[in-house]
């Protein structure tokens, strides 16, 4: 058996298990030869090409490798896997199980006094859709999350703005280059009172990490929505950047993961809320 490590969209379960068995010494009658980088690296570095490609200089050329490499940040992981033999260390199967998600169901959420609403908007990368979610702090300090809707982008932004007019709306976090600038402009023109955040990549990474941390830490609550459960119980991690950050993909072919992304953004806004500063008037 030979080949490259599994990619983020091809789990390669048999290959992964065989490697683990041999490297751990549990398989006595098999050997393993590997040319790979231990960490995510600069795939455009020719020195690393020679360290990880034994056929380079004979049947493989530098020109061939150079032509295969991508230019964007998102291609970095795949380039490392395909050309530097990088093995992704996190579990590329389901990131959140159905049982883990159902453990957080609540039937009658009680809102905190003077509660604030935090909205997350995600423009899908794989489909022409946009999803909206909301998060709010409960009376017991848990964070309640809810998926509001996922609609085609062509339906325009009026339906989103309708929710943002809520008098308790505090912040809306909008992610997705496909429409965040237009939505920001529409919100401002509609004179909605809520703060608008267009998160940086580092903040999206933080939002996803915090969502899972609080989910597994029993801080998140939800109302058992079938569409949201389907998205969350069929998700997998996708690497973002070079620092171990992750986002989400769906393990179901043709499925939209933006509902989960929107929920994670809304939760992030709520979890980081410090409360309104009281105005002090001195005479």
Mark where each language-model region is.
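P-loop NTPase catalytic cores that bind/hydrolyze ATP
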Residues: 1-9, 77-86, 115-116, 255-271
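Flexible loop/turn segments at secondary-structure boundaries
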Residues: 7-13, 41-43, 90-93, 125-129, ...
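Active-site proximal loops enriched in glycine and acidic residues that flank catalytic Cys/His/Asp
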Residues: 3-4, 36-39, 83-85, 122-123, ...
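Metal-dependent DNA phosphodiester-chemistry modules and their immediately adjacent helices/loops
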Residues: 27-45, 185-276, 281-283
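Nucleic-acid-processing active sites and adjacent nucleic-acid-binding tracks
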Residues: 102-110, 128-178
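ASCE P-loop NTPase helicase motor core
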Residues: 1-60, 155, 164, 182-191, ...
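An active-site-proximal beta-strand-loop segment
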Residues: 116-134
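ATPase catalytic-site recognition across NTP-hydrolyzing enzymes
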Residues: 35-120
């Amino acid at each position: 058996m030979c080949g490259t490590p599994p990619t983020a969209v091809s789990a390669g379960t048999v290959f992964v298990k065989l490697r683990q068995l041999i490297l751990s010494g549990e398989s006595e009658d098999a050997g393993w030869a590997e040319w790979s980088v231990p960490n995510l690296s600069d795939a455009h570095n020719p020195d690393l090409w020679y360290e990880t490609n034994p056929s380079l200089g004979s049947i493989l050329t530098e020109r061939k490798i150079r032509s295969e490499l991508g230019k964007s940040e998102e291609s970095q992981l795949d380039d490392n896997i395909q050309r530097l033999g990088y093995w992704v260390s996190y579990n590329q199967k389901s990131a959140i199980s159905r049982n883990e998600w159902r453990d957080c169901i609540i039937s009658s959420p009680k809102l905190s006094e003077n509660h604030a609403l935090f909205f997350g908007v995600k423009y899908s990368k794989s489909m022409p859709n946009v999803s909206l979610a909301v998060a709010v702090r409960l009376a017991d300090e848990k964070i309640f999350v809810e998926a509001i809707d996922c609609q085609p982008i062509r339906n325009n932004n009026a339906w989103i703005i309708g929710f943002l007019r809520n008098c308790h709306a505090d912040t809306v976090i909008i992610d997705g280059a496909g429409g965040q600038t237009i939505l920001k402009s529409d919100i401002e023109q509609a004179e909605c009172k809520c703060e608008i955040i267009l998160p940086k990549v580092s903040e999206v990474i933080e939002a996803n990490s915090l969502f899972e941390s609080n989910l597994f830490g029993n801080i998140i609550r939800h109302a058992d929505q079938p569409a949201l459960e389907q998205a969350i119980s069929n998700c997998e991690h996708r690497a973002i950047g070079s620092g171990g950050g992750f986002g989400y993909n769906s393990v179901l072919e043709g499925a939209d993961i933006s509902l989960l992304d929107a929920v994670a953004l809304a939760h992030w806004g709520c979890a980081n809320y410090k409360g309104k500063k009281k105005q002090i008037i001195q005479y």
